[in-house]
């Protein structure tokens, strides 16, 4: 039975968000680094740093906090395509989340990217997750 690293990222961020923790520690792989870069660029997390611990690399992500209250933003992440059921879409049928307010992360032939980037480049791919 294989590991689903994308589901691990989503679960870690969701659990830290519900538990009102400020940071999340995620095992570092190429896929996780690309997804965390997208989350950082889109403003869902504040800061990311790479941490080495006994020959293993981890990404330590700081969740985005509200200015008025000290709790983190409620970020909803949903895994779509999974190892048992892959979901693919062409660029014209990529769903829009909350009318464009949320993002869809796709795995394409040109790497992992958001739905906006995939539409601009005119390529589809595997729908990894929704974030809003």
Curated annotation (Swiss-Prot):
GO biological process: translation
Localisation per UniProt entry: Plastid, Chloroplast
Gene3D superfamilies per UniProt: 3.30.1370.30, 3.30.1490.10
Family annotation (PROSITE patterns): RIBOSOMAL_S8
A single cellular component GO annotation: ribonucleoprotein complex
PANTHER family per UniProt: 40S RIBOSOMAL PROTEIN S15A (PTHR11758)
Function recorded in the entry: One of the primary rRNA binding proteins, it binds directly to 16S rRNA central domain where it helps coordinate assembly of the platform of the 30S subunit.
NCBIfam families: PRK00136.1
Recorded family membership: Belongs to the universal ribosomal protein uS8 family.
Record note on quaternary structure: Part of the 30S ribosomal subunit.
Listed name of the protein: Small ribosomal subunit protein uS8c
Gene: rps8
């Amino acid at each position: 039975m294989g590991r689903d690293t994308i589901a691990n990222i989503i679960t870690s961020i969701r659990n830290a968000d519900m538990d009102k923790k400020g940071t999340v520690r995620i095992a570092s792989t190429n896929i996780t680094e690309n997804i965390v870069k997208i989350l950082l660029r889109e403003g869902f997390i504040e800061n990311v740093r790479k941490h080495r611990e006994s020959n293993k690399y981890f990404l330590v992500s700081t969740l985005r906090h509200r200015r008025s209250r000290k709790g983190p933003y409620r970020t909803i992440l949903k895994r779509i395509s999974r190892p048992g059921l892959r979901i693919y879409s062409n660029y014209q049928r990529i769903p829009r989340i909350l009318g464009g307010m949320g993002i869809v992360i796709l795995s394409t032939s040109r790497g992992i990217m958001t739905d906006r980037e995939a539409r601009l480049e005119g390529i589809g791919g595997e729908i990894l997750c929704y974030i809003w």
